[in-house]
């Protein structure tokens, strides 16, 4: 085929005319040092604090230290195959996690990726893990109860929706058990539960997931886990990821319960990370902003006003103490951030009182407003009577010649202690709690042997279920014990006692 010279020039002109060069400008830098899950990158001039950076092998990192000539980053993945001299690109985004209804019933890692082998998750988009907490005008006061199903807590240390209540105690005192019982008790109450496991053994998390599945609680729960084998940065972002997933539902007007298990390990992960990127250490080698990492997380728990949908996010952070020392750095920090604490004691646990709640130093600063009036009526004197019993019991060890009044108080105290004991994974409905506590507080159990109290409670509640279901229903409907309801309850107790003591 013969082409004329003028045709060649016109073809070249057309090609030049239609030529489009696609240029992509990417702010990139070079790794100058890498190791222990931490990298120093030179050349990222415009990098922002907390920005997501793209490393080779599809590994992402987070910029934490913005220094004069380099950026200190932590890797959110394996550093395998990444070396000095490799190129790092900016993404212009901060760490985000997927949110949506499909996360319910799933087990995910701190980046929201499924790890339960049930396939991919369809999400409703991505949200940043760090967002400002709701402001004062967006909130309303805590006024709805969040029932834990645990008698000792619902009666003396009530929790409201939107509250932050710390669960604190030594290892092996039943902190996680209280949290799991609370999740199980939300069945049928239209509350979405999120359990965040930070630095836990994978076997422990597997047991918790199995328990929740057996109890039917995974139908409304999400489990976020950053196990002990994962890097410190992934453990550090886990609670923020869980909180973001919860906020999605809260902003839709739903009620959410989130458990951080536990923030002691979270603080240790942050300390590890900070020391590796050479931040100056402070008290107990924690960095200076360790208070802020927990306050900005827990401030995101809120009860939103009606104008903002009326949703709520209730946080139950867990802190592990050493030898019962609540005056250590992290425990005092979190106590000052939260709206109260449930203190669990090793001595009580070993003495067979489970849950091992110490009502003397446990407190709920805002939950009282949310407690239903009927429970307030029956539990009003409970804390005081238990405190008096403990005091008298310690004196009674020294002598046996006690007057009748003291003996009666001691006998009543023993029965109150027995009533507050509860088996694990057996949360109790609030109307049943009210009935049995009413019987104990109003001296109906003094002629029942202490060893028979547990059996009495079980059989009494079964009896009320079969013969006097209307009383429980009336307590739920009225939410207050009026004279008519009191006399009906008292006659039912007397009626059952006759059968029991036969």
Curated annotation (Swiss-Prot):
Keywords: ATP synthesis, ATP-binding, Cell membrane, CF(1), Hydrogen ion transport, Ion transport, Membrane, Nucleotide-binding, Translocase, Transport. ATP binds at residues 169-176. GO terms for cellular component: plasma membrane; proton-transporting ATP synthase complex. It comes from the Bacteria. Its EC number is 7.1.2.2. The record marks 362 as: Required for activity. It is found in: Cell membrane. Pfam families: ATP-synt_ab, ATP-synt_ab_C, ATP-synt_ab_N. It is a peripheral membrane protein. It is an enzyme of class 7 (translocase). InterPro entries: ATP_synth_asu-like_sf, ATP_synth_asu_C, ATP_synth_asu_C_sf, ATP_synth_F1_a_nt-bd_dom, ATP_synth_F1_asu, ATPase_a/bsu_AS, ATPase_F1/V1/A1_a/bsu_N, ATPase_F1/V1/A1_a/bsu_N_sf. Its main location: membrane. The keyword Translocase applies. One of its GO terms (molecular function) is proton-transporting ATP synthase activity, rotational mechanism. F-type ATPases have 2 components, CF(1) - the catalytic core - and CF(0) - the membrane proton channel. CF(1) has five subunits: alpha(3), beta(3), gamma(1), delta(1), epsilon(1). CF(0) has three main subunits: a(1), b(2) and c(9-12). The alpha and beta chains form an alternating ring which encloses part of the gamma chain. CF(1) is attached to CF(0) by a central stalk formed by the gamma and epsilon chains, while a peripheral stalk is formed by the delta and b chains. Produces ATP from ADP in the presence of a proton gradient across the membrane. The alpha chain is a regulatory subunit. NCBIfam families: atpA, PRK13343.1. This is ATP synthase subunit alpha. It comes from Clostridium perfringens (strain 13 / Type A). The gene is atpA.
